[in-house]
From Swiss-Prot:
InterPro entries, per the entry: UPF0145_dom_sf (IPR035439), UPF0145_YbjQ-like (IPR002765)
Similarity section: Belongs to the UPF0145 family.
Signal sequence, start to end: none
Name this polypeptide is given: UPF0145 protein Bamb_4477
């Protein structure tokens, strides 16, 4: 049985890499760009709380939490998009973010959806 017969269910976070290839595997087919986009805004309460934290310096935990959640959601959406394309791995994964308005931020996670086969002896 080859990796392609299980390609949809095999795509797990462990098969996502920022490298241009997946160690121990050969890229058999490139399926195109997979992406996940999340647009988040700060709440008034969150902005007020974060504003208070800036008075004392250090890590602004409210914003850190918001950023971590947005990145995870974008990653999960990218995985879902790659699965739709039939991928069993994603290579060259990247994050990017842009402020598109006052307090509104877009986070995108993207990479190349691929089908890979395990190298002999790997």
């Amino acid at each position: 049985m080859n990796d392609f017969s299980r390609s949809i269910s095999d795509l797990t976070p462990e098969r996502v890499t920022t490298a241009f290839d997946l160690a121990g595997h050969t890229t058999a087919r490139s399926l195109g760009v997979a992406q996940g986009i999340v647009v988040r805004s700060r709440s008034i309460v969150g902005s007020f709380g974060a504003g208070l934290q800036t008075l004392f310096g250090g890590n602004i935990t409210l914003y850190t939490s918001l950023c971590e959640k947005a990145r995870q959601q974008a990653f999960d959406k990218m995985l879902a998009d790659a699965r739709k394309l039939g991928a069993n791995a994603v290579v060259a994964m990247r994050y990017d973010s842009t402020e598109i308005g006052s307090g509104i931020t877009e986070v995108i996670c993207y990479g190349t959806a691929v089908q890979v086969t395990r190298d002999a002896g790997a």
